[in-house]
Amino acid sequence: IEKILEENPDATPWTGREGPYGMTSWWPTALHFNNTEKHMDNPEVRWAINRYIDRDTLIDFAFDGHGEKSVWPMPPFAGLQASFDNLADLEEKYQPGLYDPADGDARLEAAGYTKNSDGIWADADGDTIKCPIVSLPHFSDSGPIIVEMLKQNGIDASFSVPPDVGTLMAGGDYIC
């Protein structure tokens, strides 16, 4: 965005010509799982993946340090405050935004997974945990960073922006 602003004095993002650029509070970025897919139907796998995502690093790299962490699939708008208040006990109990790779590893081990010779988590049959993220183009800044975090923790992850992503997601033809 800075390059565009340098070259075009008429260009203006939502927040003006000074960072942060864009609408940082519009809606939280989320990773969605198809819970009917093998491995993703196991809550411990989903929890492990959650623990492998370092949200501070994601914000630093994908959003140039501008953004807010959220553990809920909705922004912290004033009209939703009562909902956030009602969820506070659950958030404290489960800590859904906690970055803790050791906890992720422990959850997978407890669920019967081990790392194979390639360092990828696999079940007793040798089937690896795969998280091929399909996404809309406007998540191209964060998707590859999440993929790298997952790979570093033994999840076989990838990122793509297929032209029919809406159809894939609506039809349940995706994993992550």
Predicted features and spans:
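Extracellular/periplasmic solute-recognition and catalytic clefts
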Residues: 1-37, 48, 56, 60-62, ...
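Extracytoplasmic/cell-surface-exposed regions of Actinobacterial cell-envelope-associated
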Residues: 2, 90-99, 144-148, 159-161, ...
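Class I S-adenosyl-L-methionine
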Residues: 5-9, 109, 147, 151
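A general structural signal for well-ordered secondary-structure junctions
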Residues: 10-12, 68, 114, 156, ...
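Structured core elements
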Residues: 32, 132, 156-160
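Append "and occasionally in soluble cytosolic enzymes with long acidic Gly/Pro-rich linkers
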Residues: 41-148
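Short, well-structured beta-strand/strand-turn elements
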Residues: 114-116, 152-167
